[in-house]
């Protein structure tokens, strides 16, 4: 609520808010024992923090307290109010609002418990207090009376013949029970029975004239007949709900229809009757008894009778015994409609209004949000002076606003020249919306609205109108969405610029809290701080009381433009930074006033049981400057004739810091301790300059300074010769500032603006040698070559070296750059360290002297317009002197798959920062022939005819001989090739080999044949040297097979196969001869080149050994051998016989045997006689 108060102050020209950052260390704590102390906070009258404690128990039936807290006393005092005794459990302090000129405070309690018989209603009460906290007026001025209770109820019961007498009695018992439960002085009853005719049993007059109303039911008898339900309803409208029958003008009219089935025989339709009931504002209940209403048509008839929505007004029971089950339901529904004047979807009007749930002051008077009015559709009451209150809602829009909570939040805007009221409805359609109301002809009408997107997000729970540029008009509205859920953070705030004329209202930037707090409730509280960073745009504070497990946090966001807020916070203050253990820090906020009397805006933050006052600190800004004397380095200082030079003075540097407030306050000369570090050539590896004071490249000083300008002077030295005399020497200043606490303001400490740059860089250039006109006119030329390379073989030569030479025949050249243009397929790899030569012209010849190295930096970019790439190499940090020449080597990678055509064109261009127009010498181009490396191979396959033999008698026979060759492409590109075969086919007119070639793997291959004559004719001499039959001595068949494209890793097989004759071998006078076939791969050598060292694989041979042998007759040999063996055996036998070999040996053997037997003494056996 405080946000809208600040917006109102800004609209009325409230004092400018100063400051930038919040001091989270030196806080003022206000603490009281009141329950929920800190639920609401409000800065009031530039002196007080008013705090609500809506759950504090003051006395019996009196809840809620109000406190005023002062910064200088550090204490809080209760604000005494005369709370009417009827304001039971008011929850005072739940919402607060204030106005200025004059100062008024509005404190509200929206939970006044108002008892009306059995019901307890919730209304509200607000107290208007003056600047001295004196109670002036209450809103509303009088408590709402209990809603009227008068009810006229008619029972219309079905007496047709389809109902048995027993069931009819049960129906009368049900009527009697309902009359007993609803009977009270303000309720009257009447009864009509219908079938195909109608009978009024008693009117309202009869009911009030009898002392025992229930006795009126004793004379009711069943009519029987058809069911004329529609006509019966018409009779009720015209005969019973009339003043003649005792119906009251302002009473709620209720009709209860009880029937057991669909109407029968009735010519009158419900479409003719029901509009009459609607016009008479009769609330209708339809009770269907029996299984007939299981039928869909019967159900539709009940719905036609009943009021809308039908599910609230239709009852269906299975039988008449079940009527007693719905007695209580019917009673509760009828009780619920007490006080309603018309049968609408609203159950309540203002009985649950809860006025004061939110509040804001307008020039016409205070506005109190009434979220519970009309069944929580919501709205707001405006209380003009001396006039009746005006109720503001969406009733004219024919929109379903049930449970929308319109008025949950309120804000004031000055828009299109008129004051507008902004109301939040966070539960509208479950996603929420915010509506802008404007006053036209003393009536408030909705003019624009914006809706939420996420269910349950509470879009519009908090509002804050912001005048960004303080011109009196509202520029944008902040809409809090505290329950918006994301996986890593909870809550958001939508930044919604005020809509233009005729345009829809929409929101732009969305503000978020820190990641990691899915239940953070970011956006639960909003307030305007004013311009706290001096950019003339308002800044805001946003509370997130659910972050850090309900400890809470507050965010500060700066204005970005007249229509926007910066998306990132400038500061986050969390409860964990505060020593005290607090919860829900940021649940309420109020800012925009100077309560501490230091000229700076303060922020009051509510938490559970505690309120903290955060002060903003004075902001200092520093504007650094650096001046050099002299302003450039003289050539006499940095041009060294020798490599070693003594230290020389470069320049005097004057460093100034201008310290000032932003914005300016009345706090006097704020002092601060400033530490500044100076560094020469920050980031460079080599040292070119040093400080005289430290003899190094760094210098640090610490000073305590006040406001205004402060300067320091330092001397710079050149310690040695410099190689880079192109790039200026830089002096980098880094500084930090710590404010000196102001004792008179309780040690309030100034601080450096967080968006201030704490560094500054100044440059000290070198003097240029450009003659009297100070314009350097260089005269550059460039040439290049390809050292030791005549042809580029793509795929073999992986690198291409380009030797570049640049000459300068004019004045000094600065930022000399050589750009090489080359086709796609080449890529820059490196540049070698170059050499620079000073040249002296002697006898018309340039002589090299003074050689030194050159470091180049190269960068490659595509030149899409020409389909080329370019590499630019520059010596930016070296002056290319007049009369000098530089050489360097550039290396390119050559892609093995590059397609460069038959010639490579390279182009070079030289230029400089001197901006001298180009000449023919500044460009150069050169062509280099190009071939493409291939790696093809042909080899003899191991599956071929290796050996054949034959006899002299088989000279006329033939045998199949097969030679196989394998062809492979092992390179990185497809290549068209020809496979050549040379095969002997005839020797001196005699056939050798009738060969055919097959190549089944490649059907596109085409083969061609031609016959070749031998080159040698002395066959015998050739064979004696080498018994090989080849194409040098025999007629040969030359086969050429053309392959249009031999693909990468392709593998092909060629088979030479045919019948080999043997008759020709006798011409060679050799028993063993080798049959040789040869193969070779050929290709276009002007385009392709075999990889170096692999040329041998372009040729292959296959040899078959042929051997001749003689066939021998074995019969003579066998016969001769047999006869000779027999003769030899006969001769040997005869000789042995003649020698007595066979007889003598046998006799001696017998004698020896006998002699051995006698010598043993054994008797000799007798020979039988």
Curated annotation (Swiss-Prot):
This is Integrin alpha-X. Ca(2+) 2 binds at residues 531, 533, 535, 539. The integrin I-domain (insert) is a VWFA domain. Integrins with I-domains do not undergo protease cleavage. GO terms for biological process: cell-matrix adhesion; defense response to virus; heterotypic cell-cell adhesion; integrin-mediated signaling pathway; positive regulation of angiogenesis; positive regulation of cell migration; positive regulation of cell population proliferation; positive regulation of endothelial tube morphogenesis. Integrin alpha-X/beta-2 is a receptor for fibrinogen. It recognizes the sequence G-P-R in fibrinogen. It mediates cell-cell interaction during inflammatory responses. It is especially important in monocyte adhesion and chemotaxis. Heterodimer of an alpha and a beta subunit. Alpha-X associates with beta-2. Belongs to the integrin alpha chain family.
């Amino acid at each position: 609520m405080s946000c809208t108060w600040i917006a109102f102050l800004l609209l009325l020209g409230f004092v400018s808010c100063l400051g930038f950052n919040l001091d989270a260390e030196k806080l003022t704590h206000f603490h009281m024992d009141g329950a929920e102390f800190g639920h609401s906070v409000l800065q009031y009258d530039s002196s007080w923090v008013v705090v609500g404690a809506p759950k504090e128990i003051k006395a019996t039936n009196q809840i809620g307290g109000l406190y005023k807290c002062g910064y200088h006393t550090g204490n809080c005092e209760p604000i005494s109010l005369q709370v009417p005794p009827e304001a039971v459990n008011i929850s005072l302090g739940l919402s607060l609002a204030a106005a200025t000129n004059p100062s008024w405070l509005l404190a509200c309690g929206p939970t006044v418990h108002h008892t009306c018989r059995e019901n307890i209603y919730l209304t509200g009460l607000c107290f208007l207090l003056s600047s001295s906290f004196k109670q002036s007026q209450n809103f509303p001025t009088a408590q709402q009376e209990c809603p009227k209770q008068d009810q006229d109820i008619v029972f219309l019961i079905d007496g047709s013949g389809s109902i048995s007498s027993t069931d009819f009695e049960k129906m009368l018992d049900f009527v009697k029970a309902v009359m007993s439960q609803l009977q009270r002085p303000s309720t009257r009853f009447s009864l009509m029975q219908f079938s195909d005719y109608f009978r009024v049993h008693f009117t309202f007059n009869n009911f009030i004239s009898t002392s025992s109303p229930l006795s009126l039911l004793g004379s009711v008898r069943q009519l029987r007949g058809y069911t004329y339900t529609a006509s019966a309803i018409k009779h009720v409208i015209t005969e019973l709900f009339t003043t003649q029958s005792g119906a009251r003008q302002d009473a709620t009219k209720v009709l209860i229809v009880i029937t057991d089935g669909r109407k029968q025989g009735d010519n009158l339709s419900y479409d003719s009757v029901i509009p009459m009931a609607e016009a008479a504002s009769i609330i209708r209940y339809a009770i269907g008894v029996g299984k007939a209403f299981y039928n869909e048509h019967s159900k539709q008839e009940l719905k036609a009778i009943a009021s809308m929505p039908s599910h609230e007004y239709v009852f269906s029971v299975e039988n008449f015994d079940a009527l007693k089950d719905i007695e209580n339901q019917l009673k509760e529904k009828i009780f619920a409609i007490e006080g309603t004047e018309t049968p609408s979807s609203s159950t309540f009007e203002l009985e649950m209004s809860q006025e004061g749930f939110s509040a804001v002051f307008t020039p016409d008077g205070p506005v109190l949000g009434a979220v519970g009015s009309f069944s929580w559709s919501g709205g707001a009451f405006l209380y003009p002076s001396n006039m009746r209150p005006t109720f503001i809602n969406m009733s004219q829009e024919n929109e379903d606003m049930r449970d929308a909570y319109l008025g949950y939040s309120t804000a004031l805007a000055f828009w299109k020249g008129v004051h507008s009221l902004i109301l939040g409805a966070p539960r509208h359609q479950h996603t929420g919306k915010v509506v802008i109301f404007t006053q036209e002809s003393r009536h408030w009408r909705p003019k624009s609205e914006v809706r939420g997107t996420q269910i349950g997000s509470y879009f519009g729970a908090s509002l804050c109108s912001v005048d960004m540029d303080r011109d009196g008009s509202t520029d944008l509205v902040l809409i809090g969405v505290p329950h918006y859920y994301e996986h890593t953070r909870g809550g958001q705030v939508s930044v919604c610029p005020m809509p233009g004329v005729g345009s829809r209202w929409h929101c732009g930037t969305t503000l978020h809290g820190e990641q990691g707090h899915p239940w953070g409730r970011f956006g639960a509280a909003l307030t305007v701080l004013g311009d706290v960073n001096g950019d003339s745009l308002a800044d805001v504070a946003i509370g997130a009381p659910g972050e850090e497990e309900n400890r809470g946090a507050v965010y500060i966001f700066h204005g970005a433009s007249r229509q926007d807020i910066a998306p990132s916070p400038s500061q986050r203050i969390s409860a964990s930074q505060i020593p005290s253990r607090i919860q829900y820090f940021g649940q309420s906020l109020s800012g925009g006033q100077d309560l501490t009397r230091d000229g700076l805006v303060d922020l009051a933050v509510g938490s559970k049981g505690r309120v903290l006052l955060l002060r903003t600190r004075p902001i200092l800004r520093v504007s650094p400057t650096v001046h050099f004397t002299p302003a450039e380095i003289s050539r006499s200082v940095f041009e060294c004739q020798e490599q070693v030079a003594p230290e020389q003075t470069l320049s005097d540097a004057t460093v100034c810091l201008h310290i000032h407030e932003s914005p300016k306050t009345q706090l006097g000369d704020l002092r601060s301790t400033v530490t500044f570090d100076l560094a020469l050539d920050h980031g460079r590896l080599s040292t070119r300059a040093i400080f005289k004071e430290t003899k190094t490249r760094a210098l640090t000083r610490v000073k305590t300074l006040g406001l205004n300008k402060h300067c320091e002077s330092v001397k710079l030295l050149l310690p040695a010769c410099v190689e880079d005399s192109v790039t200026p020497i830089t002096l980098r200043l880094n500084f930090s500032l710590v404010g000196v606490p102001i004792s008179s303001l309780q040690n309030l400490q100034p601080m450096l603006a967080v968006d201030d740059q704490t560094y500054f860089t100044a440059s000290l250039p070198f003097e240029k040698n450009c003659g009297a006109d100070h314009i350097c006119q260089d005269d550059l030329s460039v040439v290049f070559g390809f050292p030791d390379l005549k042809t580029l073989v793509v795929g073999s030569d992986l690198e291409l070296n380009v030797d570049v030479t640049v000459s300068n025949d004019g004045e000094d050249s600065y930022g000399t750059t050589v750009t090489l243009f080359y086709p796609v397929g080449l890529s820059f790899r490196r540049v070698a360290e170059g050499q620079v030569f000073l040249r002296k012209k002697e006898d018309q010849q340039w002589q090299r002297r003074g050689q030194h190295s050159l470091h180049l930096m190269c960068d490659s970019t595509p030149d899409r317009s020409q389909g080329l790439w370019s590499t630019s190499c520059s010596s930016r940090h070296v002056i290319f002197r007049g009369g000098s020449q530089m050489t360097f080597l550039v290396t390119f990678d050559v892609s093995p798959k590059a397609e460069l055509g038959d010639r490579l064109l390279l182009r070079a261009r030289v230029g400089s920062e001197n901006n001298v127009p180009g000449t023919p010498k500044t460009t150069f181009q050169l062509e280099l022939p190009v071939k493409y490396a291939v790696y093809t191979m042909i080899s003899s396959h191991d599956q071929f005819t290796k050996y054949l033999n034959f006899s002299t008698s088989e000279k006329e026979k033939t045998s199949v001989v097969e030679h196989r060759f394998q062809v492979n492409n092992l390179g990185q590109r497809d290549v068209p090739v020809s496979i050549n075969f040379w095969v002997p086919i005839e020797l001196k007119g005699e056939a050798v080999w009738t060969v055919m070639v097959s190549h089944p793997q490649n059907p596109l291959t085409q083969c061609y044949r031609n016959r070749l004559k031998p080159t040698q004719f002395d066959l015998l001499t050739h064979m004696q040297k080498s018994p090989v039959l080849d194409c040098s001595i025999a007629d040969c068949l030359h086969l050429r097979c053309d392959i249009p494209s031999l693909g990468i890793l392709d593998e092909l097989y060629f088979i030479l196969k045919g019948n080999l004759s043997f008759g020709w071998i006798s011409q060679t006078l050799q028993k063993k001869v080798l049959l040789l076939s040869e193969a070779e791969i050929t290709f276009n050598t002007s385009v392709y080149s075999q990889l170096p060292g692999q040329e041998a694989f372009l040729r292959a041979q296959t040899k078959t050994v042929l051997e001749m042998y003689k066939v021998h007759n074995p019969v003579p040999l066998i016969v001769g051998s047999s006869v000779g063996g027999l003769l030899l055996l006969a001769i040997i036998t005869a000789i042995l016989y003649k020698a007595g070999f066979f007889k003598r040996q046998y006799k001696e053997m017998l004698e020896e045997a006998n002699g051995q037997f006698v010598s043993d003494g054994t008797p000799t056996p007798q020979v039988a006689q």
